[in-house]
Amino acid sequence: MAAIKKTHYVEKYNYGSGVVDLGEYIISFAVSCNLGCEYCYLRYSKAPKKPVLYNLLKGNFSEEIEILFSSSSGMEKNFYFNAGETTDSLLTMVHFEELYKMIEIIREKAKKYNVKCFIELRTKTENIFKIGKIPISDESTKVIYTATLAPQNVIEKFEKDNRIAPLQRRIDGLRYALSCGLLVGIRLEPIIFYPITGLSYKEILNSTQILLTNYKALLHSCKDVLDSENFHSLAFSTLRLTKEQYRILKDKGSELCFPEMFLCPDGKYRYSRPIRVTIYKELINYIKSTSPQLINKTLLSFEFDYIWEACKLKVKKLTNLL
């Protein structure tokens, strides 16, 4: 049974101190996710252990959207909503039923106030194949189906729940979404330094090359998706951990706690700057060589402007891709 939310459904995303703002609003139509990915911040937060789904129709969601659009006063005409931050968008079919209601509410208000909206549904599941009625896009409201992708060895190591789709099925889901007329996006978030072959300088270089080989192979395997005219955006982000996550994972000897991780200005642990820049630059250069048109649709998530600059990537917002 869906609950009534006591706080806001819609909030501007707080990226953290110094992190580039991509212009998203987060829609908390549900909270928590029991897929159990080892790196997910929800496992280490105060989120309920059992996922909670909110009743949008009985709550204040419609009023919040109305206020947001009406108060923009022409200054903000493009809105990007992320419905996959506080839970997996397609965790269950009941989740999707609430999402469908949410999309229709936003569509109605967008037409009323003459604004354009993108709504991102983000998932690691293959539940899109179970959906009977796919939401349609129109001029005012476009739905983006995004899949979080990782090499299969990373999935098997850190995403062990049997409800999580293997890599190939996630890519198949993207193709299916395209066939249904949806826009699609790919999120390589988080890029995880795995396997670690050793801690000497030479061994870290070797591990980096293995990582890059695996992620380039992943991108190659979905090149048809990347080259689709309905492809919206590609985002890269290496692993980041809260202080509490890092402490817990380090205490239990998790392979997520790579020794070359440092506390950043936003209070999150990340790989060292040289490692992050190397990974991003190599993947960006790969995209430039295989699908150069995608550079204008490529972003770094949860990164600082000096990292974008070091990678020679122009800072952009998701709303600029409308």
List each model region and its residues.
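Short cysteine clusters
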Residues: 33-40
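Conserved Radical SAM active-site core
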Residues: 2-25, 41-146
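Conserved C-terminal portion of the radical SAM core fold
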Residues: 169-245, 300
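Hydrophobic faces of well-ordered beta-strands that scaffold small-molecule active sites
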Residues: 79-83, 119-121, 145-147, 184-188, ...
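Conserved radical SAM core fold
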Residues: 86-91, 125-130, 143-164, 190-198, ...
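Well-ordered, non-membrane alpha-helical segments in soluble/globular domains
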Residues: 57-67, 96-105, 163-173, 204-222, ...
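Auxiliary Fe-S-binding modules of radical SAM enzymes
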Residues: 216-322
